[in-house]
């Protein structure tokens, strides 16, 4: 997955971080079966790149047997992004 995404985005593989968070889904006060929700936080890319990344994620998740997947993109802004690393 990482090599495909890095190629589509045009970035080094080590720029990409995946987080797997297990969730419970509820509707009408009852627990219901869930589905994968893939959230992508990134700096703005072209529509073509976004579409390609969505396709890669869709194909990967559905290839694992899930009939439904949501892919949600959130655009980050350079002037509002802070990253700190202790030396």
Where are these regions (language model features)?
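Interaction-mediating elements
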Residues: 1-87
């Amino acid at each position: 997955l990482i090599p495909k995404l890095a190629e589509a985005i045009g970035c080094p593989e080590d720029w990409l971080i995946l987080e797997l968070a297990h969730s419970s889904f509820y509707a009408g006060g009852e627990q219901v079966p869930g589905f994968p929700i893939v959230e992508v936080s990134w700096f703005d890319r072209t529509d073509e790149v976004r579409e390609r990344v969505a396709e890669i994620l869709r194909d990967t998740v559905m290839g694992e047997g899930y009939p439904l997947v949501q892919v949600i993109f959130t655009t980050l802004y350079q002037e509002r992004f802070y990253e700190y690393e202790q030396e």
